[in-house]
């Protein structure tokens, strides 16, 4: 009765109005699962391939009909007849069917849509929540949210090189309270921006994109918003994080970090050593607990030097650096580069490989941060993954836009369902830092 009888994909739109895939999986029993696939703006060069049509006459070349056809005509034929509960076998079958190291034949977007839909159909068949199906009886940790309240870089038109300025309510007692703290700071920030005559339009991930005078102006304004909302900045309250997305402004030919790409003529040009010095300066000055992609994705020497300098004090997250890939993560662990991995399901393409990356990170003492993409949908699977794996941290945007709020609302439901079992670890989620 749990045998897959039908698999169907269609083209839908993501939060940026670009095409993406939605996949449905059906079983003999009538159990059903649906998965929707996100898409990134700043992407690592080593990510699994997101298959696009390239037909400029349709969606500017971003159509996904090829990936849809691959699901309906190739993948469906291969997995119909499988037991929907056999996630690993199905994921491995799709990987083998593709046959390329980066899922470039069928498309990681095609494969991921099926992988998510299969898991949801299995949970539906067993009549259990998705997080419980994926994580088992030990599922209990609600993630500390990284809330991206200011967007820069490739996520907005704001003249700031760093892509995200985030707040983390590490001192909150529960996830529900953490969400409230974040929302109140977000609204306080909006008021401050209006008073300064700055724009309050939001970027791709729901954060504001004002024309600040620079990075420090952005941080100082966030600190004022934290205070205005009635909270304190620091380990007992709310801490700050960056996604530098350094690969977006790294000049490989000159081997420099060229901030002028986003900040104009006044933007600094820094060597790797100067980039590390600058990040350390910010950490010394402000209550910063996490920095994502502080160095270029191919600057391994820079990453090792940054980790040696700041790795005991700050969570150093590899996103473009690791691309949710166990091969790159294994090298990072061996070379002591970074101390955390960002987990994006569409960077690798299956739930099986996603869970393997999280497990490898934890075994090495690295933290794992489950993350959305800038092009999202109403699919809230990453919320369930964060809880199922007890990852301890989630990054899913600001406190606006339904595509972001859908994940937060799902986490509220899960916290309610878990009841007294639920744990919110806050500052303890950063378990590999020296306090």
Swiss-Prot record:
Residues bound to (2R)-2-phosphoglycerate: 163, 344, 373-374, 395
Entries under InterPro entries matching the protein: Enolase, Enolase-like_C_sf, Enolase-like_N, Enolase_C, Enolase_CS, Enolase_N
Major localization class: cytoplasm
Disulfide bond positions: none
GO term, biological process aspect, one: glycolytic process
Keywords: Cytoplasm, Glycolysis, Lyase, Magnesium, Metal-binding, Secreted
This protein's GO CC annotations: cell surface; extracellular region; peptidoglycan-based cell wall; phosphopyruvate hydratase complex
Function: Catalyzes the reversible conversion of 2-phosphoglycerate (2-PG) into phosphoenolpyruvate (PEP). It is essential for the degradation of carbohydrates via glycolysis.
Cited HAMAP family: Enolase (MF_00318)
PANTHER family: ENOLASE
Name this protein carries in UniProt: Enolase
Organism: Streptococcus agalactiae serotype V (strain ATCC BAA-611 / 2603 V/R)
Gene from which the chain derives: eno
């Amino acid at each position: 009765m749990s045998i897959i009888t039908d698999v169907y994909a269609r083209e839908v739109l993501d939060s940026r109005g670009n095409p993406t895939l939605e996949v449905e999986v059906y079983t003999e029993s009538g159990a059903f699962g649906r998965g929707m696939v996100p898409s990134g703006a700043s992407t690592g060069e080593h990510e699994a391939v997101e298959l696009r049509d390239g037909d400029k006459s349709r969606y500017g070349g971003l159509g996904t009909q090829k990936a849809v056809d691959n699901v309906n005509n190739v993948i469906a034929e291969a997995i119909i007849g499988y037991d929907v509960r056999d996630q690993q076998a199905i994921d491995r079958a799709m990987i083998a069917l593709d046959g390329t190291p980066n899922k470039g034949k069928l498309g990681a977007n095609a494969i991921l849509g099926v992988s998510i839909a299969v898991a949801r159909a299995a949970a539906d068949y067993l009549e259990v929540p998705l997080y419980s199906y994926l994580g088992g009886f030990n599922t209990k940790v609600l993630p500390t949210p990284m809330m991206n309240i200011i967007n820069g870089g490739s996520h907005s038109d704001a003249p700031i090189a760093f892509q995200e300025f985030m707040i983390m309510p590490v001192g909150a007692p529960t996830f529900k309270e953490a969400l409230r703290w974040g929302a109140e700071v977000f609204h306080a920030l909006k008021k401050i921006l209006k008073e300064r005559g700055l724009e309050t339009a939001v970027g791709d991930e729901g954060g504001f994109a004002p024309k600040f005078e620079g990075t420090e102006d952005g941080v100082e304004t966030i600190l004022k918003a934290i205070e205005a909302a009635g909270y304190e900045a620091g380990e007992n309250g709310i801490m700050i994080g960056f996604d530098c997305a350094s690969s977006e402004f790294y000049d490989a030919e000159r081997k420099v970090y060229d901030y002028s790409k986003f900040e104009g003529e006044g933007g600094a040009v820094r060597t790797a050593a100067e980039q590390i010095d600058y990040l350390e300066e910010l950490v010394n000055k402000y209550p910063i607990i996490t920095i994502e992609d502080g160095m270029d994705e191919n600057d391994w020497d820079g990453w090792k030097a940054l980790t040696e300098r700041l790795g005991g004090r700050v969570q150093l997250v590899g996103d473009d650096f690791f691309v949710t890939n166990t091969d790159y993560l294994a090298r990072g662990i061996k070379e002591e580069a970074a101390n955390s991995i960002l987990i994006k399901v569409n960077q690798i393409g299956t739930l099986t490989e996603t869970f393997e990356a999280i497990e490898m990170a934890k075994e090495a003492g690295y933290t794992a941060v489950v993350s959305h993409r800038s092009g999202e949908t109403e699919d809230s699977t990453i919320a369930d993954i964060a809880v199922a794996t007890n990852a301890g941290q989630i990054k899913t945007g600001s406190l606006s836009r339904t595509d972001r709020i859908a994940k937060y609302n799902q986490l509220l439901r899960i916290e309610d369902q878990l009841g007294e079992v639920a744990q919110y670890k806050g500052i303890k989620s950063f378990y590999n830092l020296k306090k």
